[in-house]
UniProtKB/Swiss-Prot annotation:
PANTHER family: LD18447P. This is Peptide chain release factor 1. Pfam families: PCRF, RF-1. Keywords: Cytoplasm, Methylation, Protein biosynthesis. It is found in: Cytoplasm. The keyword S-adenosyl-L-methionine does not apply. The keyword Zinc-finger does not apply. Peptide chain release factor 1 directs the termination of translation in response to the peptide chain termination codons UAG and UAA.
Amino acid sequence: MLNKLESAKDHYIRLEEQLSDPDIIGDQQRFRKLNKEYSDLKEIVQAYDRYISNRRQIEEVLGMLAKESDPEMKALAEEEYNELLADQPELEQQLKLLLLPKDEADSRNVIMEIRAGTGGDEAALFATDLLRMYQRFAERRGWKCELLEFNEANTPGACKEASMAISGHDVYGIMKFESGVHRVQRVPETETQGRIHTSAASVAVLPEAEEVDIEIRKDDLRVDTFRSGGKGGQNVNKVETAVRITHAPSGIVVACQEERSQLQNRERAMKMLRAKLYDRELADKNKERADLRKSMVSSGDRSAKIRTYNFPQSRVTDHRIGYTSHALPQILDGNLDDLIEALKLYEQTARLQEQQQ
């Protein structure tokens, strides 16, 4: 493991030098490729540096203990030695987790779909809350977020179903844990008796596919155009700019009406179709995965109940790992980092155990 880490650090230093080379800076395609490699190695190298620093400090303290005769100084050195030694297993475990091979789709952008489920108007309002939560999370991480489709429910402004494209660094690797059924428990504004209602919304996170990943034959597509309309039926477009594409072999139907031109809506609809087909392909490849890992990443499975948002108790519980937080308002405002880090750690640990079996 240490040889592998030393090689990674050497490569990281070489990349750092290359990224300051004017010739490489001038070649944007090559610069982006090298910069991604550099970013991918950064966390590993930083963890390795902490591990090496810890080992050196242990050696220094052991040397001090061998020479020290003063009882008080020796006791302090022993205390420091025990603290440093206690840190070693955690640092080693962190390195093992970071060295695990990444899923091939982790670095990709995503298409996210949110649909109101059981619960009528309350489910649509909750789907709107989730849409805003993910938009805020993307904003906090500096990602680009584009709304592809928004179908309004009976309640003005509430989301029946929506889809959006999120692009940035390692988006799928971070967002993939959000696929599944999200449940909400709260008292609706229209509830006069103060009773708590339960409703749900489903989320699907699909890795974005490039044209080279998925071959789509034009003959397999049926493209329909229709007039797009604003929320609540307002600002109905007189020109058929909205696009619906049906992929005959799979039966998948996608639509986009958020852009002003038919060409832009068609491009976005094709992006959604590629993502759905690529997700199916990945699901077929991953059938051999261990049950634990499949339960962590639903790959767009809308039937898996993953999380409950309880408003009366200001509680969020992720049922896959037993994670509970009482910071519900902050989470709904896009502060998902702690929750997602816990999910990532759980999945990485499961993969490590899988590898060691």
